[in-house]
Amino acid sequence: LTPHYRHGMFDFDLDAINQAYEVMYAEAEKIGVMLYLGCEYHVDSGITHRLKSGRCLTMAGSDYVLAEYKYTSNYAAIRGSINELQANGYTPIIAHAERYEVFIRDTGLLDDCRSMGAMIQINADSVIGKEGLRTKSLCKKILKADLADIVASDSHNMKDRRSHMKEAYMYVSKKYGDNRAKRLFETNPGKILDVCQETDVEDC
């Protein structure tokens, strides 16, 4: 679960978030589903301070941070935030990388981000064309070059923003092989939970 945090716009109440998570966790556990809490952080100059102070959440209590940027962000700003997070012990996961103009113009920059230690996430809806043919084409380019690390749902509700993970998994498996699909949908996301469990399970 990754509620949005954007300073001055989505300043969530952490206590309320934790209470809601506990209710959802208990209900999901009844059907054998494990839920983990994090947040999608709209990157700003105060990101490391808020993370270290506990005012914002990492992914499942790990050192991974789901980082969102302005769609018009320049590459210098993105590089700078990656370096800052890395220097403070965090691993950034660039959320829905297919949406940013800088990567639309040059997908090769994704490889540069990865070389700095960032992970690249793309949306299931984008992969299967729910966000338009242009975005689907870009995801094809990213996947063909093996520049993505994680495919995630970006689901917001069960109506117009429901999850299409199954369809996306089947598409990736058919186009790029089952090993690639497992890596993007299972293995790499699972690494975040493995790190969490190795450090302190009760914090997850």
Predicted regions mapped to residue ranges:
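Conserved short secondary-structure transition element at the edge of the structured enzyme core
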Residues: 122-124, 139-153
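Conserved, mostly hydrophobic/aromatic
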Residues: 3, 96, 154, 189
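Mid-to-C-terminal alpha-helical segments outside catalytic/metal-binding sites
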Residues: 165, 169-204
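Short beta-strand segments at enzyme active-site cores
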Residues: 1-4, 36-38
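Glycine-centered helix-coil hinge/cap
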Residues: 132-135, 177-178
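Short acidic/histidine-rich active-site segments
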Residues: 2, 147-163
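Active-site environment of divalent metal-dependent phosphoester hydrolases
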Residues: 5-9, 42-45, 99-103, 127-130, ...
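Extended substrate/RNA-proximal surfaces in nucleic-acid metabolism proteins
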Residues: 10-121, 199-204
